[in-house]
């Protein structure tokens, strides 16, 4: 550890908290500043701050937690996690071109080798991480602090201090911002990152922000009343694909399901201004079996009309750092649509890779500050060069996966390619063949490399199918010629 300077982390969500745990191994002066305290439920919080879509934990996130060296933390997190072995796709049976009223479920396994994803409660994960930080003496956490300005030259940041709404009937803001010096600033303050905005004042930073033509609404399937148990098999991500609509259900530790309705904003706005009967018809048409079987009409009506309908935002930027002074990680650097379940995992992987590179460049081993700055600048440059490409790759994959989830999972082309690739992965492992989903979720291959390998596999399959067609033509042509020769 070094005593000089201070590592300041803006944002105390899962990514910022994990960064603080990593930093605590190298530095004895780490401070985390967070706007809200999720151990409480502040009154009047913005709907954006109250979001509770379940996290999906996969190999990348698990490896980052393991690398933190906090085995008890990982065990505590995994105790509350629910394994999901695949997707359970719901709908009505199709006979030819007609759709019957009979409900059906189709299981799509995630991985031929039995790997699973894990459904995590957002608040439980945050609490587990913050309890670990509370037990780490060289990390200090400051809640109700909002970053308002940064001077990257003098390495100082200023925070607006807000009163704790749980202890005050009329929360107010302090008139004098709190000044905090830093040696190294890590921004993990989400999609609307102030750290990123401040970095843009000091360096050219390419920035792209895109809203999807889809909004989301959170709903809940409660446990059964008599036995307080799951209403659906718990070890699956349940999906009702509906063309331009989609309904997903994630299992929760309290035997409920956290559900997300995705739909075009115009459609949800129209439903919100319509009578409940229209809402019930909409669910019966697009998500059969949900209402009233899983959610009663009264509960669905209450939840839908009272829950906020929130936008989906995707962000790309480059670079992710400023000299030796600052870096942004997680959603601050690469907010993505939630359709690959990689937002949390990519953010945690950011932390692992960032500190691996800082370690490789011996940033924390340099005694002189000038040498340390040069080493950290080199490490951060390498970090940006690597993570920008990977962040852009998973951002694009996440957007593309939405099209697959809301309808493509039932397409013959999707099923055929999945069947062939899984067969090659299972029976000819020496080829190194894997499905795109398996590479993304059950490996730590760079996202950009995953895309390249998947495209190569696509070309190989296309070539194989073309050769197959050509072979059929040649065989049948030869047989036809032989037959005509015999007739003569």
Swiss-Prot record:
GO terms for molecular function: FAD binding; kynurenine 3-monooxygenase activity. Keywords: FAD, Flavoprotein, Membrane, Mitochondrion, Mitochondrion outer membrane, Monooxygenase, NADP, Oxidoreductase, Pyridine nucleotide biosynthesis. Pathway: Cofactor biosynthesis; NAD(+) biosynthesis; quinolinate from L-kynurenine: step 1/3. Signal peptide: none annotated. GO terms for cellular component: mitochondrial outer membrane. Disulfide bonds: none annotated. InterPro entries: FAD-bd, FAD/NAD-bd_sf, Kynurenine_monooxygenase. It is found in: Mitochondrion outer membrane. Its EC number is 1.14.13.9. Its cofactor is FAD. Catalyzes the hydroxylation of L-kynurenine (L-Kyn) to form 3-hydroxy-L-kynurenine (L-3OHKyn). Required for synthesis of quinolinic acid. PANTHER family: KYNURENINE 3-MONOOXYGENASE (PTHR46028:SF2). This is Kynurenine 3-monooxygenase 2. It comes from Aspergillus niger (strain ATCC MYA-4892 / CBS 513.88 / FGSC A1513).
